[in-house]
Amino acid sequence: MSLFDHSVSELHKKLNNKEISVTDLVEESYKRIADVEDNVKAFLTLDEENARAKAKELDAKIGAEDNGLLFGMPIGVKDNIVTNGLRTTCASKMLANFDPIYDATVVQKLKAADTITIGKLNMDEFAMGSSNENSGFYATKNPWNLDYVPGGSSGGSAAAVAAGEVLFSLGSDTGGSIRQPAAYCGVVGLKPTYGRVSRYGLVAFASSLDQIGPITRTVEDNAYLLQAISGLDRMDATSANVEVGNYLAGLTGDVKGLRIAVPKEYLGEGVGEEARESVLAALKVLEGMGATWEEVSLPHSKYALATYYLLSSSEASANLSRFDGVRYGVRSDNVNNLMDLYKNTRSEGFGDEVKRRIMLGTFALSSGYYDAYYKKAQQVRTLIKNDFENVFANYDVIIGPTTPTPAFKVGEKVDDPMTMYANDILTIPVNLAGVPAISVPCGFGANNMPLGLQIIGKHFDEATIYRVAHAFEQATDHHTKKASL
């Protein structure tokens, strides 16, 4: 039995009782990485020397009264979250040798909590993708079946947890990039409310949509991690000054009287029968525990995909303009003048998907098309947000599938961008509205790949979605199943 089969609270007790050491946890992580990483390819960079030194330092503090629950816990960090002195590439050749000189706020908070960073995790380049096949280095595989994708863009973050390489990880979610891979890999992934977690130190893709969040084996562990990284940060102008409650206090298993909304759009066209049936089965479980549910409508959801790709690509076009070979990142050697430097550096440094989205965003922002595309997309975004607010006036949570289908095979969709984009139709509306949502395991498809249940909450009401997710998790055995890698 792996140490990582235990929860954070169980491991904390073992540490305090001196049944295990922090070094044991770190060595468990690196041993598992040595055993499976050649197949999974979840990591881009390991930090073995520093991790082992930190573990030795913390071993001397075991049993101290001020040790928090995350003391000594091994974590992986998505490679678009900067780490001081530890290579941060965004899985792009553009930043292949970038060593940041500061830590992201979330990394600072986790260091203060005495977690240990095992390494940096693979992803779709600059967080643009749904399968991890867009990594500029190599594709991560799904631990449940290596022929299948782990999802994206936080595919490395989800795969590392599912494979037992780390206890938990950080990802980022712009249009579903935590929840979709969590669903595909059979783990728990939360996108917090926009502004709940600082984005300082997150390499920007789409600044009005990006949000850092936790990926874990259980809902309880997820709540521990969010508790540690949440809160106001003066370094992030979009960080919200909203009190962070005690997320653990609500994990009682009680959902009696809970009002659940189920959008008909989330069970309709484009959603596979397996995903639909898994949600209905989950609703029956929650109904048996005293919750009630009704079908509702989010009428503007059908426009979410187009709205998202116009807005996110426009923001990416602006954010990624800084990578030009002048200040940092790679620099093309094939240069005769300044224009050559810009053009050749960007052509050689960016992958196809990143260039595709930059071109789309540049077009949407160009004069003559701005009102027709970008401005109209912003207006539709407001309508989508209003739809959520209207539903939440009468219901506590919204529930539906996380993804239309289970994971697909490697290479199956990578050459068809529109089909690939459609994998995010159920997660994108949440980002556009800025509300929180969690994906928890809820069954398996005919291909024996995991399915995820998405629970969406009101702004800054992560506590309620944790309560519902935990109650469902404890009433079922989906979370106890592990990839047999």
From Swiss-Prot:
It catalyses: L-glutamyl-tRNA(Gln) + L-glutamine + ATP + H2O = L-glutaminyl-tRNA(Gln) + L-glutamate + ADP + phosphate + H(+). Keywords: ATP-binding, Ligase, Nucleotide-binding, Protein biosynthesis. It is an enzyme of class 6 (ligase). It holds the Pfam family Amidase. GO terms for molecular function: ATP binding; glutaminyl-tRNA synthase (glutamine-hydrolyzing) activity. GO terms for biological process: translation. InterPro entries: Amidase, Amidase_CS, Amidase_dom, AS_sf, GatA. One of its GO terms (cellular component) is glutamyl-tRNA(Gln) amidotransferase complex. Signal peptide: none annotated. Its EC number is 6.3.5.7. It comes from the Bacteria. The active site is at residues 78, 153, 177. Heterotrimer of A, B and C subunits. Belongs to the amidase family. GatA subfamily. NCBIfam families: gatA. Allows the formation of correctly charged Gln-tRNA(Gln) through the transamidation of misacylated Glu-tRNA(Gln) in organisms which lack glutaminyl-tRNA synthetase. The reaction takes place in the presence of glutamine and ATP through an activated gamma-phospho-Glu-tRNA(Gln). PANTHER family: GLUTAMYL-TRNA(GLN) AMIDOTRANSFERASE SUBUNIT A, TRANSAMIDASE. This is Glutamyl-tRNA(Gln) amidotransferase subunit A.
